[in-house]
From Swiss-Prot:
Keywords: Cytoplasm, Hydrolase. GO terms for molecular function: nickel cation binding; urease activity. The lineage of its organism: Bacteria, Bacillati, Actinomycetota, Actinomycetes, Mycobacteriales. Belongs to the urease gamma subunit family. Its main location: cytoplasm. InterPro entries: Urease_gamma, Urease_gamma/gamma-beta_su, Urease_gamma_sf, Urease_subunit. It is found in: Cytoplasm. Pathway: Nitrogen metabolism; urea degradation; CO(2) and NH(3) from urea (urease route): step 1/1. Pfam families: Urease_gamma (PF00547). One of its GO terms (cellular component) is cytoplasm. This is Urease subunit gamma. It is an enzyme of class 3 (hydrolase). The gene is ureA.
Length: 100
């Protein structure tokens, strides 16, 4: 299978998010990269499902809570920005303060 660099990046991100979700299911708190991967994957999959940028900006803040991540992670994550492919093209989705 041959993948473009963009496709490789998306696949790696998807795997990182899946690994983070498995760790979360075992009761572990997520670190910074794991939290970013889960939120980013939520946005990419939401765009693929046809949700709007506005919907994803709101729902991206509900993916994880403070109880889901290690101490200090919410303070490190000011914004998560993702270029997602929507049915009408690629758009930048910004989630401000993704872990309220």
């Amino acid at each position: 299978m041959r993948l473009t660099p963009h496709e490789q990046e998306r696949l790696l991100l998807s795997y990182a998010a899946e690994l983070a979700r498995r760790r979360q299911a075992r009761g572990l708190k997520l670190n910074h990269p794991e939290a970013v991967a889960v939120i980013t994957d939520h946005i990419l999959e939401g765009a693929r499902d046809g949700r709007t940028v506005a919907e994803l900006m709101v729902s991206g803040r509900a993916v994880l809570g403070r109880a889901d991540v290690m101490d200090g992670v919410p303070e490190m994550l000011h914004d998560v920005q993702v270029e997602a492919t929507f049915p009408d093209g690629t758009k930048l989705v910004t989630v401000h303060h993704p872990i309220p």
